[in-house]
A protein has these predicted regions:
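C-terminal substrate-binding subdomain of Rossmann-fold SDR/epimerase-dehydratase oxidoreductases
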Residues: 1-3, 29, 33, 37, ...
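N-terminal Rossmann-like NAD(P)+-binding domain of SDR-like oxidoreductases, especially those catalyzing
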Residues: 1-200, 279, 287, 320, ...
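Active-site helix-initiating loop/hinge in glycosyltransferases
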Residues: 18, 202, 206, 235-238
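Residue-level recognition of oxygen-bearing side chains
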Residues: 79, 110, 117, 162, ...
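Generic alpha-helical secondary structure signal
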Residues: 91, 179, 209-213, 283, ...
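Proline-centered turn/helix-capping motifs that create local helix->coil transitions or kinks
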Residues: 132, 141, 150-154, 189, ...
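A glycine/serine/threonine-rich, flexible loop-to-helix segment
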Residues: 155-156, 207-215
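Short coil/turn segments at alpha/beta junctions that flank glycine-rich nucleotide-binding fingerprints
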Residues: 187-191, 207-208, 253
């Protein structure tokens, strides 16, 4: 196991995408559990999905005196530069991104702005945090995605695998983030760690994700479409496991070393964070149905069969995602392990409470 070399206590931590699903959960965990921490959250609160959920997440963070929220877009360089100048963050976690594989097919511009230009602005700000001999950013942690594996046939997906065949623009932007981070780590000695998240789910999640969208449709009496005739497998990973992994990774920055060429050996790492246990989409839907009935979101006599339609695979989709989490286990002694039923129960109970208000 690696020894932690970055303390979170008393630090100023910048979290981009703080009103997002993972971002808000990460802010909450840090503010709850870390002594003297100051969390600066930035989010543009786009209407890609229901802003009420984002506002609700921010409301739950506002009670912490160590939390400061800034509404702004990471694609705006001045906003980011001003933020770094004013607060001098010691740790940066970049979770702001235009998410969604299918949306990238119809709205490519927003992916270029947020995922490429936005991330470039973060890298530049990290680079200049060392100007004038300042200590600067100790560790940049950023979200990559399991989508970088594209249609790779070899499973489980390993971070040693070649990932040069993305099947969506979203995946291509995430692979680009890893390449950009590597270049900046090499040139400017910025310790950076990329995390390839695998199908994150849980309470107060993203309404565009399958489990949430299925629930909305079933409640409205609409038909749900199950892609690839139900033969897709996904490495569903509960949000608490993702956040636990992020917090552990934040505390070990890749070490700065000098290579034989006299230049820095890039202090750069990439890890998978997934459940290491892919679930068949039909099994997933069956468990979701049972938990929605249990939480009284749907009646016991609901006719699920009449509301299911098996359809072909969609453009940009892949048949399976499956994370090899061995390096994460070896380096941090941690592996996501929340069973699907436990996670979906937490979601169903949240949904029942949230929509009954």
């Amino acid at each position: 196991m690696l020894e932690y070399n970055v303390s979170l206590e008393g630090k100023t931590i910048l979290i981009t995408g703080a009103a997002g699903f993972i971002g808000s959960n990460l802010c909450s965990k840090l503010l709850k559990e870390t002594k003297g921490v100051k969390v600066i959250g930035i989010d543009s609160i786009t209407d890609y999905y229901d802003v009420k959920i984002k506002e609700e997440r921010l409301k739950s963070l506002a009670k912490y005196e160590g939390f400061l929220f800034v509404k702004g877009n990471i694609a705006d360089k001045k906003t980011i530069d001003d933020l770094f100048a004013a607060h001098k963050p010691e740790i940066v976690v970049n979770l702001a991104a235009q998410a969604g594989v299918r949306y990238s097919i119809t709205n490519p511009q927003s992916y270029v702005e947020s995922n490429l230009i936005g991330f470039y602005n973060i890298l530049e700000a990290c680079r200049h945090s060392y100007d004038g001999g300042e200590k600067g950013v100790e560790h940049l942690v950023y979200a990559s995605s399991s989508s970088v594996y594209g249609s790779n046939k070899k499973v489980p997906y390993s971070t040693d695998d070649k990932v040069d065949n993305p099947v969506s623009l979203y995946a291509a932007t995430k692979k680009s983030n890893e390449l950009m981070a590597h270049a900046y780590s090499k040139l400017y000695d910025i310790p950076s760690t990329g995390l390839r998240f695998f199908t994150v789910y849980g309470p107060a999640g993203r309404p565009d994700m399958a489990y949430f969208g299925f629930t909305d449709k079933l409640v409205a009496g609409k038909t749900i479409q199950i892609f690839n005739y139900g033969n897709c497998k996904r490495d569903f990973t509960f949000v608490d496991d993702i956040v636990e992994g992020v917090v552990r990774v934040m505390q070990h920055a890749p070490e700065r070393k000098t290579g034989e060429d006299g230049l820095p050996v890039p202090p750069y790492k990439v890890y998978n964070i997934g459940n290491n246990q892919p679930e068949n989409l039909l099994d997933f839907v069956n468990i979701l149905q049972e938990e929605l009935v249990r939480a009284k979101v749907l009646p016991e006599d609901y006719d699920f069969e009449a509301h299911k339609q098996l359809v072909p695979m969609q453009p940009g989709d892949v048949p399976v995602t499956y994370a090899d989490t061995t390096p994460l286990e070896q380096d941090f002694g941690f592996k996501p392990a929340t069973p699907l039923r436990v996670g979906l129960r937490a979601f169903a109970e949240w949904y029942a409470g949230y929509y009954s208000k």
